[in-house]
């Protein structure tokens, strides 16, 4: 029998539960029991089922995810249940309960469900927050294995970045056209400028612990590379200082011989003053002093800054030595260069009536251009009273010259001449071997320096021509910068005139025109703009125009004011005349 649709006594018919006239079978009962154990799909998809109260056969008592609107009501359902009994206190709180401590729960009950809506929360850095900039070791990127720290804990150290290893190499200089110039090409090159500045700095060094003034020399600075006192072969302990003359302001070398009270022969001093050669350090004067609390003899020589000795450069393992490897040798061309310079220096000394006297690598100064100078030529002549004959000392100079070249070629000073000759024979050319053997051999023959130069003239030709090439290079460098002094003079005149005439003063009309031309000239030099009204900064054009102004050529130029209302056509010669005239009037006024 069917049931009416709106009958309240029966449930509303659905698609899943329909009334049937037949009685339920065993299979239907099993299916119904299985459906009761299955969670409703609407609960999984939508969180609720609208047919749960109207005959849905599936289970609806499982956990579900409530919406954000019902979450708050669900969370306080147990606390705010209207069906629960009202709160009835047993008795009033005692008076002592007012001073009781505040209740702090041990744990807080967490909500069983999570809301789908994301609420932004302001995070405050806690005590366990990680600061990436606090750990310096995290800033160092080391992709390679460090063998030195295998068995040790890594230290928290910060190391600066080596930019020379990480930055790429600069691009090569582009090829310039014949009419193009660079800013560095307008001035002295950096290598020459740095060499000159280093020499100037070395000439101004002073040490306050030394005497402030000795005779007419001040600003003493020690030049000895060793900290202990050493005795020269002349028999006296000596020190070497750099000093400045209060008479001419030039730097000199002051050589002090301790406890040397020997009388000086004035005639020998005058002869030594006249010894002047490019490869010999000039001697100037000698006098006694008690400034160092003893009887010291002071010898004055010329000062050559930024120089070292051949012994320090090639034979000692010092910081300035370049010959530290046993198998490394000096090029033969360089040895011929030293050979040639020493030979002509000794030849000049012998013709002047003196000998070099005990030539050693420590007495030979060398600079960055491989130019050598023999120092201390006056020491032996003035201090030693019982000297051997001059001819005997000249012959000893020949042997000393050969020994010096042999020491440089082998890199050793403790090798006997026979072993040194074999080493030179196996390393250098036969001609160089014969040249060294000519001086170190004990054959009793008269050695002649002029004859030696004639026999080896072919090897000396490249050495003789190299100074001319270097001189030509230096002249080119100077020619590029020598006019800068005149340019500076012109700029000073322009700035003096402009700065002195900024105040409102009354001038004659003719002078006002000349001053206005100077202002226009200043704008013509430093206030050029292109067609896009952008400033033109061209150093070469400024130097070119200053050169034309200094020469006073007849080339006409147009001087235009900044507002482009005034324009004057004038030549460089007229501008130079007006500039000199106004500057002279400024001086006289």
Swiss-Prot record:
Belongs to the protein kinase superfamily. PAN3 family. GO terms for molecular function: ATP binding; poly(A) binding; protein kinase activity; zinc ion binding. Transmembrane segments: none annotated. GO terms for biological process: mRNA processing; nuclear-transcribed mRNA poly(A) tail shortening. Signal peptide: none annotated. PANTHER family: DEADENYLATION COMPLEX SUBUNIT PAN3, PAN2-PAN3 DEADENYLATION COMPLEX SUBUNIT PAN3. Its main location: cytoplasm. Residues 1-32 are annotated as: Disordered. This is PAN2-PAN3 deadenylation complex subunit pan3. Residues 497-589 are annotated as: Knob domain. Residues 201-457 are annotated as: Pseudokinase domain. A motif (PABPC-interacting motif-2 (PAM-2)) lies at residues 74-94.
